[in-house]
C-alpha cells in the first residue's frame, strides 16, 4: 500500500507543478525590485500593484553585501525564482519610508538607486535606439566586473566618440551583480542634435513637451501633489512635394504630410545623474582627469562604501557613495582604484616636479551651464517656422538649469549633514526639514516653468495650425472661383485644405486624449470645448466640400480622386483611433492580456453649435437631389473622426448626404468615454485588466491535469486489484489434507503420524529386515 500511496502523491505533485508558468515573471504588473535607505526599513516593489511596500518583517534595513541583497530578494519574493541582482540604471523617488518599531511612516521621499531582482535565466535588456543614435556592445570573457564598472566603460566609450550615453544594459552574468559585458546606446551631443533639428524643422512634426515630474511620488499618497510626466503632442509641419500628374498645367505642388508616430516624453526631473561629455586626446588624459576629481557622494542618500584617488595624498582613500550621480573617481575596491589611477598619477606628479602645472582646472562632469532665463528667452522670442527647434532648446535649457540647482542643493545638504553630526537631534531634524522644503520648492518652481513653457508652445502651435488652415481654405476658394476653373488645381488646393483640417483635428484629439489619461477631472471640464471645436471642423469641412459641387464640371472630373482622398483620410483616422484607444500592454510575462479594441467602448456624439458656421461665398448646393439618399440616423462614431458613423466615409457624390446636413438635424453631443485612471500604476494612468493565465498557459495546465489524472487513476486501479487478489489468496501451513471418506480411526492414526507416532509393528518388521 505504501508504494501505491507514494506514487499517488508523486503524481499529484507533478500535476500541480504543471500549473505553474515556466516564465518567472509571468503575470507580474511590475518588475521585482528592492530599495534601501540606511536608517529606514527596506522597501520592495509589489509586483501585483506596482507600488513600493515596506519590509514585511519590520526589521530589515540596509544591506552591505551583494549576497545579502540576493538573499533578501529571495525572502521578499518567495514565489519567484530569484537568481541574481543588478543595480538599476536610474535612481527613483520613494516615499513613506518606515523606521523600525514605528507604525507611522514618513511621507517625504528619498532618492535611491534600487536593485533589480532578476527572475529565472538571465535575459539582456531590450534597448531602444532613437534616430541618429548607435547601438554598441563590449564583452570580455576574461573580466568579471560590477554594474558600475560597465557603466563607466559604456560612458567613456560614448565620450570617445563625442556622443552621450543614452541607455545601457548588462550582458553575460558571471556572479552576483557581476557581468562580462555591456550593451549601450550612444546619441549625438546636444549641440549637434540642435543643429540637426534646426535643419530638419520642415520635415518633423512639432512636438509638445509636457514636462517630467517623477511618477514615483504618486504611490497613493495624498500629501503631495505631483506633476505627472506628460506626453508630447504633434504639431503641424507641412512638406511640399511635386505633383507628378502631367495634366496639371501650372505645376502646383501637392502637400504630403510627413506623418510620424506620436512620441511619448516622460523625462524624470528627479534624476540628478550627470553625464560626462568631455572629449579627450588620449587614454592617459582621460584617466588623469578622472583621478583628479574630488570624491562626490551624489544627490542620493545611500551609504555605499567606495574608494577614490586622493591627489594630495597620492593614494586611494575610502568615502561613502550616495548611490547616484557623483563622478567617475569612484571605485569598488582599493586595488581597482590604484590599478587605474596609481601609475598614471605618479607619472603626472613626476612631471609637475620639472615643470609647472598648466592644465585647466578639473571640470565637474555636469551638464552644460544654462542661463537663468531659460524660459524667459523662449517666451521673448516670437514664434516662427522653427518653433519646434526653439522649443526643444528651451526645454533642454530648463532641464539643465533644474539639474544644476538640484545638484547644488544636494551638495549643500550633504555638507550640512556632515556638520550636524554632533548637534542635538532636534537641530538635525530642523536641518533635514529645511532642505526637504528647499527641494520641494525647486521642484514646484520647475513644474511651474514647464507649465508656462508648454502653454506658450501650445498657443503657438494652435496659431500656426489656424494660419495654415485659413490659407489653404482661401486658396481652395480662389481656385474654385477662377475663370475658367482648372480641375487639377482645384483638387490640389482641396487636398491641402483637407490635410490642414485633419492636422487640426488630430492635434485636438491627441491633446484631449492626453489630458483624459493624466487628469480625468480636467478632461471632464474641457470636454465640451473639445467637442465643440470638433463640431466646427466637421461643419467647415462639409460646407467646403459641398462648395465643390457649385461647379459641376470640375466635380465630375475629379470625383474619383476626391473619393480616394477622403477614403485615405478615413483610414488614417481609423489608425489614429486604434493607437489612441488601445491600452498599452504592461507585463513582464505572458499572462497580461489587455482588452481588445472591440471591448473598449468609446462613443462620441456631436455637440450642437450655437449658431451656424458661416463663410463668405460658401453656400451648400442641393441641385443634385438628395431626396433619393436615406437619411442619416447614426450618431455614434469613433473619437478620431468626430463625425456620424454613416457619414465617416465622407463621400462627395451628388446626393450623398454631405451637402444637405443641417445643424438642427444633428443630435446633442455626448461623450460616453470612460475616463479611466488607475492610481495604483501611475506610469500609464489607465485601468489595466489582467487575467490569471493566457490561452497558452491554460492549455499547458489542462494537458498536465489530464496526464496527472490518468496516472492517478492507473495507480488507484492497480492498487485495488493487488489488494483484492491478496485478500482471496489461500493460506497454506504445510498440513496434508485428509480424505473425508476415511474412518475416524484412520483419521486419528494420520494425525498421530503427523505428530511423530510410529507403529511398533511396522518398526519391528523393519528392524528384522535390516
From Swiss-Prot:
| Topological domain ranges for the Extracellular compartment | 18-701
Q: Where is this site: Cleavage?
A: 197-198, 219-220, 671-672, 678-679, 687-688, 690-691, 711-714, 720-721, 739-740
Report the subcellular localization. Answer: Cell membrane; Membrane; Perikaryon; Cell projection, Growth cone
**N-terminal signal peptide:** 1-17
Q: Name one cellular component (GO) term.
A: nuclear envelope lumen
Keyword Disulfide bond tagged? yes
Residue interval(s) of motif Basolateral sorting signal: 724-734
Q: Where is this region: Required for the interaction with KIF5B and for anterograde transport in axons?
A: 756-770
**Zinc-binding: annotated span:** 181-188
Tell me the GO BP annotations in alphabetical order: adult locomotory behavior; amyloid fibril formation; apoptotic process; astrocyte activation involved in immune response; axo-dendritic transport; axon midline choice point recognition; axonogenesis; cell adhesion
Chain positions with Phosphoserine modification: 198, 206, 441, 730
Query: Sorted alphabetically, which Gene3D superfamilies does this protein's record hold?
Result: Amyloid precursor protein, E2 domain, Amyloidogenic glycoprotein, amyloid-beta peptide, Amyloidogenic glycoprotein, copper-binding domain, Amyloidogenic glycoprotein, heparin-binding domain, Pancreatic trypsin inhibitor Kunitz domain, Pleckstrin-homology domain (PH domain)/Phosphotyrosine-binding domain (PTB)
Please list where the region (Interaction with PSEN1) is annotated.
Answer: 695-722
Disulfide bonding pattern of the chain: 38-62, 73-117, 98-105, 133-187, 144-174, 158-186, 291-341, 300-324, 316-337
> Region Disordered: which residues?
194-284
Keyword list (alphabetical) reads: Amyloid, Apoptosis, Cell adhesion, Cell membrane, Cell projection, Coated pit, Copper, Cytoplasm, Cytoplasmic vesicle, Disulfide bond, Endocytosis, Endoplasmic reticulum, Endosome, Glycoprotein, Golgi apparatus, Heparin-binding, Iron, Isopeptide bond, Membrane, Metal-binding, Notch signaling pathway, Nucleus, Phosphoprotein, Protease inhibitor, Proteoglycan, Secreted, Serine protease inhibitor, Signal, Sulfation, Transmembrane, Transmembrane helix, Ubl conjugation, Zinc
Glycan-carrying positions: 542, 571
Q: Where is this region: Heparin-binding?
A: 391-423, 491-522
Q: What is written about domains in the entry's comments?
A: The transmembrane helix undergoes a conformation change and unravels partially when bound to PSEN1, facilitating cleavage by PSEN1.
Tell me the function of this protein.
Functions as a cell surface receptor and performs physiological functions on the surface of neurons relevant to neurite growth, neuronal adhesion and axonogenesis. Interaction between APP molecules on neighboring cells promotes synaptogenesis. Involved in cell mobility and transcription regulation through protein-protein interactions. Can promote transcription activation through binding to APBB1-KAT5 and inhibit Notch signaling through interaction with Numb. Couples to apoptosis-inducing pathways such as those mediated by G(o) and JIP. Inhibits G(o)-alpha ATPase activity. Amyloid-beta peptides are lipophilic metal chelators with metal-reducing activity. Binds transient metals such as copper, zinc and iron.
Query: What name does the UniProt record give this protein?
Result: Amyloid-beta precursor protein
